[in-house]
Amino acid sequence: MLLSLFEFLSEYYRGFNVFQYLTLRAILGVLTALIIAFLVGPAMIRRLSLYKIGQQVRTDGPQTHLTKAGTPTMGGALILVAVAVSTLLWSDLSNRFVWVVLMVTLLFGLIGGIDDYRKLRYGNSKGLSARTKFFWQSVVGFATAILLYYTAQAPVETTFFVPLFKDVAIQLGPWFILLTWFVIVGASNAVNLTDGLDGLAIMPTVLVAGAFGVFAYLSGHAVFANYLGIPYVPGVGDLVVFTGALVGAGLGFLWFNAYPAQVFMGDVGALALGAALGVLAVVTRQEIVLVIMGGVFVVETLSVIMQVVSYKLTGRRIFRMAPLHHHFELKGWPEPRVIVRFWIITVILVLVGLATLKLR
């Protein structure tokens, strides 16, 4: 939005050309989203408390969580507002990737918002049925996959790449649609499952999003992409503004979500953030890197799958409780210890993911 204005003004004063630089707009995206979160956050929390939009807590979970009942939820709306405003202000709005990523994020946020609303309306922690939620996630996921497939402007956009092996490139053809659906919906649910402790999901999301900003910037630059042996995807570089906005909004939200949390993001935030990471991985052609950097999300999801399968087949549980973070809580780990250790693991995994840029 502002980019068009600055392009017009640069005809009268060349100093406005500085806003053409992606790095500057990314920094401004971070700061804008961060400021919005700081300014709007307190008022939103007060309003959520006023209307009694509070968290519904499972009675079969760790007993320490019972004190969280009534804490304002749906704070993820703050993240979405900050990301949307910042992205629209500083991105090149003629870029198709910007619109795809932003719309996927907002649509998954809408699904999560409806889920949160139903939990509040009926006074329990169930919300939408798993089948209904999965159906609408799949609708958006498949629609996005089909859109990306039929608007692809180069073969690289539908090719599967394997990190560490620069010569391994598999042209997916129509299978790209299935992979894209799986990555977006899978990432969305993985982040949602991880969002069970104060700040547990948002910090890894910020770290992974920041790393994808690096991948987007390098993949959108022909010289850098060729030097590093990564896919060159024209136009994807402008997503560094979106990832910057996501980092800024996430840090701003963490200010209020850090232990002990003043607000929870709810499904409106968790489903949206996971979908955002998924679609970022798809358009930068770094699906495997998402699995590496988002290892915490992957393990949390696998713990749930393993728990369910084991119980159905043998009647026994592998973990004291799933997702995995609850297992450690029931082992006696204080909540802050679980959170920070999962953060540390994510930092390490993100560094490993970034290292794949050079190890090819």
Curated annotation (Swiss-Prot):
Pathway it works in: Cell wall biogenesis; peptidoglycan biosynthesis
Molecular functions per Gene Ontology: metal ion binding; phospho-N-acetylmuramoyl-pentapeptide-transferase activity; UDP-N-acetylmuramoyl-L-alanyl-D-glutamyl-meso-2,6-diaminopimelyl-D-alanyl-D-alanine:undecaprenyl-phosphate transferase activity
Disulfides per UniProt: none
Catalytic activity: UDP-N-acetyl-alpha-D-muramoyl-L-alanyl-gamma-D-glutamyl-meso-2,6-diaminopimeloyl-D-alanyl-D-alanine + di-trans,octa-cis-undecaprenyl phosphate = di-trans,octa-cis-undecaprenyl diphospho-N-acetyl-alpha-D-muramoyl-L-alanyl-D-glutamyl-meso-2,6-diaminopimeloyl-D-alanyl-D-alanine + UMP
Cellular compartment(s): Cell inner membrane
InterPro entries linked to this entry: Glycosyl_transferase_4, PNAcMuramoyl-5peptid_Trfase, PNAcMuramoyl-5peptid_Trfase_CS
Record-listed E.C. numbers: 2.7.8.13
Nuclease recorded as keyword: no
Topology class, membrane: Multi-pass membrane protein
Residue spans crossing the bilayer: 26-46, 70-90, 97-117, 134-154, 168-188, 199-219, 236-256, 263-283, 288-308, 338-358
Keywords: Cell cycle, Cell division, Cell inner membrane, Cell membrane, Cell shape, Cell wall biogenesis/degradation, Magnesium, Membrane, Metal-binding, Peptidoglycan synthesis, Transferase, Transmembrane, Transmembrane helix
Entry coiled-coil feature ranges: none
GO cellular component: plasma membrane
Superkingdom of the organism of origin: Bacteria
One matching Pfam family: MraY_sig1
Required cofactor names: Mg(2+)
GO BP field: cell division; cell wall organization; peptidoglycan biosynthetic process; regulation of cell shape
Enzyme superclass (EC): transferase
Known role: Catalyzes the initial step of the lipid cycle reactions in the biosynthesis of the cell wall peptidoglycan: transfers peptidoglycan precursor phospho-MurNAc-pentapeptide from UDP-MurNAc-pentapeptide onto the lipid carrier undecaprenyl phosphate, yielding undecaprenyl-pyrophosphoryl-MurNAc-pentapeptide, known as lipid I.
Family indicated by similarity: Belongs to the glycosyltransferase 4 family. MraY subfamily.
PANTHER family: PHOSPHO-N-ACETYLMURAMOYL-PENTAPEPTIDE-TRANSFERASE, PHOSPHO-N-ACETYLMURAMOYL-PENTAPEPTIDE-TRANSFERASE HOMOLOG
Protein's name in the database: Phospho-N-acetylmuramoyl-pentapeptide-transferase
Lineage, opening ranks: Bacteria, Pseudomonadati, Pseudomonadota, Gammaproteobacteria, Chromatiales
